[in-house]
């Protein structure tokens, strides 16, 4: 299944679709769109949600990129098959997809706080995840598991943040919490 979809995507490539997919994949590189969105939300006064988004991205980076990729060491399809790549060939391992997991972690966290915007960001996350398959740098299973991992991380981070961290900050660091809320 993984290889059939990859081969199909290679057959349907064209210049217009290539340019869209390059732009979409770069939105997720380094978490760019999620960090920019978080900065804007923080600037607009949404401090609690902004901190939660950052925490979900940090937690996701540790679990996905530092632990799982290096533990499982799945080679990327672009390392195995000689295919002309449209983007730089990543040097880290393939499974799970960091773009997919970080995108879903951030998008779902955003949707917890901003229901109306949530669907837009989840669509962006899905497009970013799909673009990684299109670019032949991930197998579909890398992206599916990455998206599921990001979803779980968003839920866990939100629950821990709401029940423990936020409460602790309010009770024990009231002056700092008030200052951050004021900025």
Language model: regions and residue ranges:
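N-terminal transmembrane-helix/juxtamembrane module of multi-pass inner/ER membrane proteins
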Residues: 1-32, 65-92, 168-183
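Membrane-embedded catalytic cores of phosphoryl/pyrophosphoryl-handling enzymes
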Residues: 80-183
């Amino acid at each position: 299944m993984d290889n059939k979809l990859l081969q199909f995507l290679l057959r349907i490539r064209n210049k217009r679709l290539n340019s869209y997919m390059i732009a979409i994949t770069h939105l997720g590189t380094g978490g760019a769109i999620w960090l920019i969105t978080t900065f804007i939300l923080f600037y607009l006064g949404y401090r609690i949600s902004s901190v939660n988004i950052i925490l979900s991205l940090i937690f996701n980076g540790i679990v996905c990129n530092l632990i799982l990729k290096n533990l499982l060491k799945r080679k990327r399809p672009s390392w195995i098959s000689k295919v002309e790549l449209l983007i730089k060939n990543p040097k880290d391992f393939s499974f799970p997809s960091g773009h997919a997991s970080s995108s879903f972690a951030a998008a779902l966290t955003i949707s917890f706080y901003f229901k109306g915007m949530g669907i837009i960001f989840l669509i962006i996350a899905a497009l970013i995840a799909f673009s990684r398959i299109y670019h032949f740098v991930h197998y579909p299973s890398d992206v599916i598991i990455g998206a599921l991992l990001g979803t779980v991380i968003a839920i866990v981070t939100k629950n821990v943040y709401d029940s423990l961290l936020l409460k602790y900050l309010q009770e024990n660091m009231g002056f700092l919490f008030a200052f951050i809320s004021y900025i």
